[in-house]
């Protein structure tokens, strides 16, 4: 099936998911510079918050260089055509955080839950719709649920008022057939006017292929990040995805060369380490582990001498999900004790 002429919305993640590899330490000037570049390149939607969403600043998730309010206040006035979104995880972000974001000019709120827990999003989705926001239900770790189970959860979020639903490959574990099955069944189940999106990670180098599969199956919003700046091996690299879309005739409205310049000249220079598919990031995708666990596992390796890969495999075995970052330390300690017993 030809996708030529299909229009999609690309949504940049480099200033939100990109907070994870930066340990939430992106400066206000870096935020402004990258946001201006994305805006000029034609990116229509840019996400800006702590890596774990509004209210994410904590011992568990990490303290950012600046508050969400400061980041949003720095970026929003700089934009000429792009709009700003914010992520909110119920239990981390509150309705007061949501109101704050709205007052500062955020136009899109993405309410994120684990893929089996859509019922905890009702209050936040309902308020976002009442405030007139573009309201997105964001189902994380979607590889852990069957297409049929995702349909049930997506319809719950739609019933609460979400005008767009996201199928989110938080672990970068899916292959194109997995994406096709989930996106197509959810697309068939939702109202025709409800939009559908896909968020990928590049932990098996499938970010671009999975995103194209999502578009072919009916998604019209696709997350990506300039230079792939995001958790794990990064998000779908925006400049590559836009170039592939251009080759296929999919209309993104983003200039290929301009977004490539943003990636190369603005994003790559702020990386603490190259965003690449190393053995630990590969393990995230292979074992189906939440991408933002990568740095936690590397810190545990440095502290306890247990290889990060072994820790990540154990986290996958335990089927840990976002919000259980404290269990990474527990898993590492258990492995240390087991090693001592063997010795």
UniProtKB/Swiss-Prot annotation:
Instruction: Give a yes or no for keyword Lyase in this entry.
Output: yes
> Recorded E.C. number(s)?
4.1.3.39
Specify the superkingdom. Answer: Bacteria
Q: Which reaction does it catalyse?
A: (S)-4-hydroxy-2-oxopentanoate = acetaldehyde + pyruvate
Q: Which GO terms describe its biological process?
A: catabolic process; L-leucine biosynthetic process
**Alphabetical UniProt keywords:** Aromatic hydrocarbons catabolism, Lyase, Manganese, Metal-binding
At which positions is Mn(2+) bound?
17, 199, 201
Question: Per its UniProt record, what PROSITE patterns does this chain match?
Answer: PYR_CT
Q: Where is this site: Transition state stabilizer?
A: 16
Q: Which GO terms describe its molecular function?
A: 2-isopropylmalate synthase activity; 4-hydroxy-2-oxovalerate aldolase activity; manganese ion binding
Q: Does the keyword Lyase apply?
A: yes
Q: What residues sit in the active site?
A: 20 (proton acceptor)
Q: Which residues form the Pyruvate carboxyltransferase domain?
A: 8-260
- Binding annotation for substrate: 16-17, 170, 199, 290
Q: What class of enzyme is it?
A: lyase
The text of the family note is: Belongs to the 4-hydroxy-2-oxovalerate aldolase family.
Q: What is this protein called?
A: 4-hydroxy-2-oxovalerate aldolase 2
């Amino acid at each position: 099936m030809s996708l030529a002429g299909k229009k999609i919305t690309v949504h940049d993640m480099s200033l939100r998911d990109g907070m994870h590899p930066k340990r939430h330490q992106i400066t206000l000037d870096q935020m402004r510079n990258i946001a201006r570049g994305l805006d000029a390149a034609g990116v229509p939607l840019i996400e800006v918050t702590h890596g774990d969403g509004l209210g994410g600043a904590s011992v568990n998730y990490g303290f950012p260089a600046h508050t969400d309010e400061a980041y949003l206040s720095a970026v929003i006035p700089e934009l000429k055509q792009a709009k700003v979104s914010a992520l909110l995880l119920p239990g981390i972000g509150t309705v007061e955080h949501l109101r704050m974001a709205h007052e500062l000019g955020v136009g899109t709120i993405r309410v994120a839950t684990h893929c089996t827990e859509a019922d905890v999003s009702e209050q936040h989705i309902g308020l976002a719709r009442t405030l007139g926001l573009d309201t997105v239900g964001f189902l994380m770790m979607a590889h852990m649920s069957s297409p049929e189970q995702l349909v049930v959860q997506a319809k719950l979020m739609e019933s609460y008022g979400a005008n767009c639903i996201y199928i989110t490959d938080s672990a970068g574990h899916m292959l194109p057939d997995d994406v096709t099955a989930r996106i197509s069944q959810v697309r068939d189940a939702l109202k025709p006017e409800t939009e559908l999106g896909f968020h990928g990670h590049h932990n098996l180098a499938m970010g671009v292929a999975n995103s194209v599969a999502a578009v072919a199956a009916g998604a019209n919003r696709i997350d990506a990040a300039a230079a792939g700046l995001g958790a794990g091996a990064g998000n779908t690299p925006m400049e590559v995805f836009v170039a592939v879309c251009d080759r296929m005739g999919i209309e993104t409205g983003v200039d290929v060369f301009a977004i490539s310049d943003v990636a190369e000249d603005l994003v790559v220079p702020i990386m603490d380490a190259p965003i690449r598919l190393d053995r630990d990031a590969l393990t995230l995708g292979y074992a189906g582990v939440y991408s933002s666990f990568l740095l936690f596992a590397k810190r545990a390796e440095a502290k306890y001498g247990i290889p990060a890969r072994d820790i990540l495999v154990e986290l996958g075995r335990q089927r840990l999900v976002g919000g259980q970052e404290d269990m990474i330390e527990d898993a590492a300690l258990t492995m240390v004790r087991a090693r001592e017993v063997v010795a």
